[in-house]
């Protein structure tokens, strides 16, 4: 009889709408901490490499926790301006130990570089951690004199050419990996021919995170497709799953029902574009009227699968502005509905500009949610030279659930 009651309770929890869930996490003491992790050139103690190379701005964050518990935070280090083209390196920071969970600025190692060879554009970090702790890091790259729309002016006065479908002029997809907890990285391998459709010019992987499925495969979201890793951990072979209607920047999670959930940036301001499926196929993408979005990247995280199962989503919850960052929880088996959540501005970061834009999340070893979020100083009238930094936030479920509007 007791087991039957438990089964009935589990079914009720699964099918109740998000607003009806009495989450036991709400009774815990709310916790939140935050500080700038990637400090732009206009800030006190700006982040530089050990070589002395500094960066005007940092953008496009990604964060993962390895199987040892160490946290790796990635970003684009933009050398001369905040813009999407020109000399951009892929940089990162690690927590000093596997147990400190990045709780304070002193818990992080200094800035390092994954790759920055040449004056080209390295970006869109999209890591995924395998069962054997191999960290696969997918990257996008294009040549120094190319940009997405062309006719942009580099610091030396060179006018960029528009990215095209030639081998020299197209966006390339690279993969690097680490087998020592992110301490060192292999030379990036160009997988464009294998994993990017023929004839494409522009391309983007992630940015954000890949995932490991309960069935063992790895899945990395990319423009118009998923990249699938099959085979033994640390020795994966990669293939492509095309997705009709998918966006240029996608996020992915395996929901509690075992299905895959793509939540993509819309091509225009409005609402997030969502589709559900499996490795065998996806349904159609459709706007989610409950998730407004200003045509920006977002991030999604499966926090846990046991009852009450929780899926976390973070974006700018506005159809017009990137400054409305809000974190939400869904209790639905398919992440159909998210609660109101909590605005990140409830815990503002002093002296770090105007928070909002791209983000990435991971679950820390002490059961917190760790989130990297962009911040823009908007201290230049044209926006071209406005400095960009990246904030690190740690908060628990109770902090979300005890928000003033939840």
From Swiss-Prot:
- Say which domain of life the source belongs to: Eukaryota
Q: Return the Gene3D superfamilies for the record.
A: 2.120.10.10
| Residues that, per the record, bind substrate | 59, 78, 84, 148, 265, 322-323, 331-332, 337, 358, 376-378
Provide the catalytic activity annotation: Hydrolysis of alpha-(2->3)-, alpha-(2->6)-, alpha-(2->8)- glycosidic linkages of terminal sialic acid residues in oligosaccharides, glycoproteins, glycolipids, colominic acid and synthetic substrates
| Enzyme type, top EC level | hydrolase
Signal peptide segment:
1-20
Task: Drop me one GO molecular function for this one.
Answer: exo-alpha-sialidase activity
A single BP term in Gene Ontology: ganglioside catabolic process
Q: What is its EC number?
A: 3.2.1.18
Induction details = Expression is increased during conidial swelling and germination in presence of human serum.
Protein family (similarity comment): Belongs to the glycosyl hydrolase 33 family.
Task: State the PANTHER family in the record.
Answer: EXO-ALPHA-SIALIDASE, SIALIDASE
List the protein's name.
Exo-alpha-sialidase
